[in-house]
Amino acid sequence: MTNSRRDFLKKGALGTAAIALSGSTSGAVAGILESRTQKIPHASHFGAFYAHVRDGKIVDITSQLDSDANPTVMTRALADRVTTDSRVKYPAVRKSYLEGKGRGDLRGKEEFVRVSWDTALDLAANAIKKAQKSGGNEAIYNASYSVWSHPGAFKPNVLAGRFFNQIGGAVATAGEYSNGAAGPVNTTVVGDMEVYSIQTAHEQIIANTKVMVLWGADLYKTNRGGYSVPNHRCYDAYEEYKKAGIKVVLIDPIYTTTGQEFKADWIKIRPGSDVAMMMGMMNYLYKSGKYDKEFLEKYTHGFDQFLPYLLGKTDGIDKTTAWAEKLTEVPAKTMEDLADLMVSNRTFIAGNWAMQRAEHGEQVDWSIITLASMIGQVGLAGGGFGFSMHYEGGGDAASGKRTVGGLSQGKGGAVNLTIPASRMSDLINKPGQTVSYKGKTITYPKVEFMLSAGGSPIGHQPNVNELIEAMRKLDTIVVLEPWWTPTAKMADIVFPATTTLERDDIASGMSYSNDRIYAMKQVVKPAYEAKDDYEIFTLLAQRFGTEKKYTRDRSVKDWIEGLYSKSYAKREMNISFEEFWEKGSVHYEIPEEARKFVRHEEFRKDPVSNPLKTETGKIQIFSDKFASYNYDDFKGHPMWFEPKEWLGNKELVKKYPLHLVSPHPTYRIHTQLDNTWVQNVHKVQGREPIRISPNDAKKFGVRDGEVVEVYNDRGSILAGVVVTNTIRDGVAAIEEGAWYSPEDSSQKRPRCNSGQVNVLTSSRPTSQMTNATSANSNLVAIRKIDVLSPNLAYNPPKIKGAWDENDFTKIINNISYN
């Protein structure tokens, strides 16, 4: 039996990655080929796998089924990253920069020149020294926001931070794009970020939960990939959820994969209005007397300071369900029925991260925590709340044992300045201006030099055109990348880095279960002139006299063995490094006690002996610290703030009638894999899909499969229409992560022909509290388009002096032997 690509992909959201070598080859030949094939263990953000290598080439990828319970199709696309035409093959420098002319305005427009490694390294080192001399190390911006580049210890952002900190430091980022609004608030409200904390075990939810409210959480989609190496066991747990008969309610403008799998009741909330719905439900619970007064008194602080606002005594607006209905477009009775359902059953609220990536995103988790406190089930088995069930297999029981850590970045040296992660464009555009962050004021320095290793600023920063305009103001941009990403094309100096398949590394299995260590063995030799990030930064360190400090005279393999030596596997299980490396992984057993874990249980049992790390040791419904900041858009208790850009803005919606959301991708992690064959599964005419409802398709006169222009004041993109009943009217969804492809780089705001959604998203900060990203607060319009320009996102730029392997063949074929 053969496996067609269609058959393979029909296996759906998970699919199997264990496709056998072709059965059409005769037995004898197959045996010979098999004997010449190496099976090398490796691991990725998509799962652990074996690369089958023959004659130095990857011929197949199969999942490590003992480690990956439900493999994803994405694992099989990893081989394509090695051989793709978009590889950076050798060091390259932008033409005008190499000629000493600078011309930052030509970034992304002109050709590159192939240079030697020494030339590129010397140019980069000289640019760093020039910036240091001109403005000190505050003139250097380490933009290596690349924690998701791969799951190994040698992450490019760590290696970059280590290098800069040993030469005096650099401007870096505070907070993050994922949870920039919620994390800093939660630490004050409940004494923990919560978004990365171990969740109540699946076993406890299966045994005790009667109602699960998915407030935007899409467990099935987002658990396909992980920060570390996923085991995908959570999908087996979800099957048990179904068998347990848990009633699931989904509050989301999209009827997600998870909603469909659980046959959830779908509440089609208007994007950006979630806090209003929570306020309405809390108002109803209070007035009906159905809230848990005892829990509030014993375990929380400041409800009495929040209550006047909830009842409208401070602002004249009673936050009733009728009030909330006008904002959310959710019927008041639906909210009241849901509140009744939640207080009368053991209920678990699964929050998500997308809601807080919106204007006033700081309010979302705080409001969920307050609602959960009024329900009174926090700390009970199967009850309470969790903000990480959709991440890293949240709910998996933890081994409690040490796996492997990473390299140290060291201290920041003379410079220890950080800016909120999403303020990248402002940092460059607004030197000398200030930004607030968690009660402090930060002054932007004048940045001249920027380095990005393994990251994708043009992939993750909202308002791409604003960012590109900023990047063209810098003196020098250096990028370390295996591929000609949109960010690499905007650089002055580009170093070709290896993919993980071309170097050794070591990784841990799942942030929560923490039950495996993986050998990420080198599978094939580095392609072309690529070097691994560790070697590149070592060569740069040589030019600053810090090489010995950077490497400590250790090779990559030395570091890997050293990291492994501190693990439970080595210290307690006595498994030698050689044995581990040969086998490819080590597995820890999960203790049965871990399957009984209930988040916040110890606090509930004895809040005096087990206080939260907050101002009062309790849940802070009101925080004196927050109130002391005196911000006009963030106060001492959770509040509803109306967004500037949403469907409730009656004037703006006349021009841009669709609310655009940008969920995580189904077949990528952010921008990763967008240059591989797996993207053909869902692209529409080579563009990123835009999902709209049948009513909106009719309203705009577009059909399924057509390409449309999506636009607002920030820019425009091409996207392929997918008409679906799984999205509410008035909302459009374009998954984030497509590679940027400007149609005409000479224009100030060129149309993106690939469908990169961040061309359209707003860089408006959430509030003065965290200045985090509000990328889900956007309005757009769409229109039909007849003439389509090509999507060139994956094409390398023109490179002078480049040598194409095909050139030799062409020359030979043209030689005439007389």
Which role does the model predict for each range below?
Residues 2-290, 331, 539-542, 698, ...:
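N-terminal export/assembly segments and adjacent metallocofactor-ligating motifs
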Residues 19, 172-173, 291-294, 335-336, ...:
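Acidic/polar loop patches that form or flank catalytic/metal-binding clefts of enzymes
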Residues 156-240, 244-246, 250-251, 275-279, ...:
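Extended redox/cofactor-interaction regions of prokaryotic respiratory oxidoreductases
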Residues 263-268, 502, 515-526, 677:
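Short beta-alpha connecting loops at secondary-structure transitions
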Residues 257, 485-519:
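Flexible glycine/proline-rich, aromatic-decorated loop/lid segments
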Residues 533-583, 671, 677-691, 695-818:
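Long, contiguous, secondary-structure-rich segments that constitute the structural scaffold
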Residues 97-119, 288-331, 523-620, 660, ...:
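N-terminal leader/propeptide and maturation segments of large enzyme subunits in energy/redox metabolism
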Residues 281, 302-424:
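Active-site phosphate/pyrophosphate-binding segments
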